[in-house]
Regions:
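Active-site helix/loop of acyl-thioester processing domains in fatty-acid/polyketide metabolism
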Residues: 101-116
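Hydrophobic beta-strand-centered segment that forms part of the acyl-chain substrate-binding groove
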Residues: 116-122
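N-terminal accessory segment detector
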Residues: 1-101, 119, 127-135, 139-141
Length: 141
């Protein structure tokens, strides 16, 4: 018996308003506990993106940034060994606390796959709280 070929990869699109409404729905049920779920979602989402970027290891961070932009997660990124600066995160919405939980999970996944070990990713600055950009600190564990 011949198995059927794998279906072509398909994508769904959510706009910024829909992402915000989903976040508010979860927060209404789970309060801030849902932020960990959003982070884990980001990790899952980031797995295939990281694998795609690793196909060109020499240009991994440039490729990772391009993928994030192509998929609508960000408008601009800048990567170093210890920090990622993001402008135009899709998760930005006015708040007293950082809101880019999924993006933080995606970035952690990128660095863990690139470095081959565990890292901690902390959103130290967020455009949601009035800053001009989001900044994520990367620390090896």
């Amino acid at each position: 018996m011949v198995s059927a070929p794998a279906p072509a990869m398909r994508y769904v699109k959510l706009d910024q308003s829909e992402i915000r409404q989903i976040k508010e729905l979860y927060e209404g049920v789970m309060s801030h506990a849902c932020h960990g779920l959003f982070f884990k979602e980001g990790s899952v989402i980031g797995t295939d993106m990281a694998e795609e970027a690793l196909k060109d290891r020499t240009n991994f961070f440039e490729r990772a940034g391009a993928i994030l932009k192509e998929r609508g997660w960000v408008e601009e990124t800048s990567f170093t060994d210890t920090e990622v600066v993001v402008k135009g995160s899709i998760e930005v919405t006015p708040s007293d606390i950082p809101t880019c939980h999924r993006l933080r999970g995606i970035l952690r996944e990128f660095y863990e796959r690139f470095k081959g070990g565990r890292v901690k990713c902390t959103e130290e600055m967020c455009a949601s709280t009035g800053h001009p950009e989001c900044r994520f600190r990367i620390e090896e564990m």
